[in-house]
Swiss-Prot record:
SMART domains: CUE
Keywords, in A-Z order: Endoplasmic reticulum, Membrane, Transmembrane, Transmembrane helix, Ubl conjugation pathway
Organism: Eremothecium gossypii (strain ATCC 10895 / CBS 109.51 / FGSC 9923 / NRRL Y-1056) (Yeast)
Transmembrane segments annotated in the record for this chain: 3-23
Protein name: Coupling of ubiquitin conjugation to ER degradation protein 1
Role: Component of the endoplasmic reticulum-associated protein degradation (ERAD) pathway. Recruits the soluble ubiquitin-conjugating enzyme UBC7 to the cytoplasmic face of the endoplasmic reticulum membrane where it functions in degradation of misfolded or regulated proteins localized in the endoplasmic reticulum (ER) lumen or membrane via the ubiquitin-proteasome system.
Stretches with biased composition (Pro residues): 109-122
Occurrences of domain CUE (ranges): 65-107
Length: 184
């Protein structure tokens, strides 16, 4: 390899290192977090003994909050109001931090000066709404399948019955077993 090729490769290597160094802090949020943490720890090593003073919250460069960020958080926390999410995103500047706060169970306050919307008062018609009424009720299987408990079906062969007759037979057999258990 001649001298010009070696010089060219060395120049490419130096250029690559410089470009990586300039782009490093803007490339990934975790890289920004690491540089901010090291900056805070080096500033606070004096009187605090290595611990950050105050709340210990790390200040990150904030991004403007857009609707996509709110939708991501609302997908995980649908019961939160969009203003609560927007306020927390403006404070934290990060969807990840907001989601972590939600998963930890922290409160999401409304922004100062914002009044929470009052849900409209619904009249007492909710109880008469057929969709909200409990439709679960016990069925009387003897009446439903027209089974006479006094009838003797013990001589009937189960495999020879059609579907409806099998249902009646199973209800009759269950009734007889229940009567036998209650007499014991």
């Amino acid at each position: 390899m001649d001298q010009s090729s070696a010089l060219f490769l060395a120049l490419l290597l130096v250029l690559f290192v410089l470009v990586k160094w300039f782009i490093k802090t803007e490339s990934h949020p975790s890289a920004q977090h690491a540089t901010v943490d090291t900056g805070l720890s080096s500033q606070s090593t004096g009187a605090a003994g290595g611990r950050a003073q105050g709340t210990g919250a790390v200040r990150r460069r904030r991004r403007p909050v857009n609707d996509d960020m709110i939708e991501v958080v609302q997908a995980l926390a649908p019961h939160l109001h969009s203003e609560q999410i927007r306020y927390d995103l403006e404070r934290s500047g990060s969807v990840e931090a907001t989601v972590e706060r939600y998963l930890r169970g922290e409160d999401f306050p409304f922004p100062p000066g914002y009044t929470a919307p009052i849900p409209p008062e619904s009249p007492q018609q909710d109880s008469s709404d057929p969709r909200k009424r409990s439709n679960i009720r016990a069925d009387d299987l003897l009446q439903k399948y027209d089974v006479d408990p006094a009838e003797d079906m013990s001589a009937v062969e189960f495999h020879e019955l059609d579907m409806d007759a099998r249902k009646r037979f199973m209800v009759w057999r269950a009734r007889k077993r229940m009567e036998a258990n209650l007499q014991k």
